């Protein structure tokens, strides 16, 4: 006897989770608060509304999001079915007609005999049965309080994201390894030194740079612990040098003295393929970030795997709270899916919903749960949000820095293609587990 699944949230993750569970013969009640109640960012009455952009980003396997989309195609994702049915010309990217996309997904969901769409706001999490929480990045009110009851201090309402660069794009001829005062293993950080002239030019460019204007639903809330670098720079020319760029305790071994200023890069993952710019959360536009941060000695040719941002975003500390299957450790009948888990982006949200929908159905039927291989884009993203360092967890787009490294020395221009090939091969080997 299968248990009915309750899905809270009719966005990309919730719809994908509901669809995958129903495809596997399980009844689903999908709760969506629209059109009775709208968030500040939503305007369409339908399901799976794309709020900010109609672009689903590049289709090439040279980009990890392209691989993620190809995996979802092969897995017969409703999200990708809808995207292909409503796509518009966009060069090498995949973009959709937002209204038609929402209408398509809504029609498919509402016409499925095993899915009941309930148009009402959820204010309490059911105390029995299997539940998928996919309420999205603007979760607020009583439902946010309910999630807070489960998550405790590990529920956040704003993100403060620093850029991440690929380790193999750092120029170690200019950067040096060291920890402040030799603490830890002594070389835990990669340090990019600046002299006084470089520092002053860097600060000038930050102050003059174009910034992202906050959305109407985003109140500007800056906490001292995660102040944007441009805000710090506006407080005085030396503020950054006494904040995230302070050089004290860091001696450049090539000259034997402390630099005028230092940008520290901290290892982001166990494989040491990604490093983040410590304390460099920012609201500079992405083109300005690339231009200005490539002024940093050692990062002139940096490959940015994630760019900085600060915005309204309800999410949990997934590594602290969730199992590898995105079940709540403290109550395994509850799954989390979508951006509330810390995945960032449309495709990533659908991917999260796919994996959770499959496992919610399997739990309902008393079957063993499955985890996608880490070599796949779906698996690499899932592993990141549930198995990264909880203390520094922030939302993340899919990127090749999340994947297990390839064995041996690989030419840089060949690496992405080989990672994509390995990912698709791993996916094909995983498919029998899903049947």
From Swiss-Prot:
Record field: catalytic activity: uridine(54) in tRNA + (6R)-5,10-methylene-5,6,7,8-tetrahydrofolate + NADH + H(+) = 5-methyluridine(54) in tRNA + (6S)-5,6,7,8-tetrahydrofolate + NAD(+); uridine(54) in tRNA + (6R)-5,10-methylene-5,6,7,8-tetrahydrofolate + NADPH + H(+) = 5-methyluridine(54) in tRNA + (6S)-5,6,7,8-tetrahydrofolate + NADP(+)
Keyword NAD: yes
Cofactor(s) this protein cannot do without: FAD
Keyword Endoplasmic reticulum in annotation: no
Location (main, coarse): cytoplasm
Compartments where found: Cytoplasm
A Pfam family that the UniProt record links to this protein: GIDA
One GO CC annotation: cytosol
Superkingdom field: Bacteria
GO biological process: tRNA methylation; tRNA wobble uridine modification
The entry's keywords: Cytoplasm, FAD, Flavoprotein, Methyltransferase, NAD, NADP, Transferase, tRNA processing
Gene Ontology molecular-function annotations: flavin adenine dinucleotide binding; tRNA (uracil(54)-C5)-methyltransferase activity, 5,10-methylenetetrahydrofolate-dependent
UniProt-annotated binding residues for FAD: 9-14
EC number(s) recorded for this UniProt protein: 2.1.1.74
NCBIfam families named among the record's database cross-references: gid_trmFO, PRK05335.1
Family note: Belongs to the MnmG family. TrmFO subfamily.
Function as written in the Swiss-Prot or TrEMBL entry: Catalyzes the folate-dependent formation of 5-methyl-uridine at position 54 (M-5-U54) in all tRNAs.
Protein name: Methylenetetrahydrofolate--tRNA-(uracil-5-)-methyltransferase TrmFO
Taxonomic path: Bacteria, Pseudomonadati, Thermodesulfobacteriota, Desulfuromonadia, Geobacterales
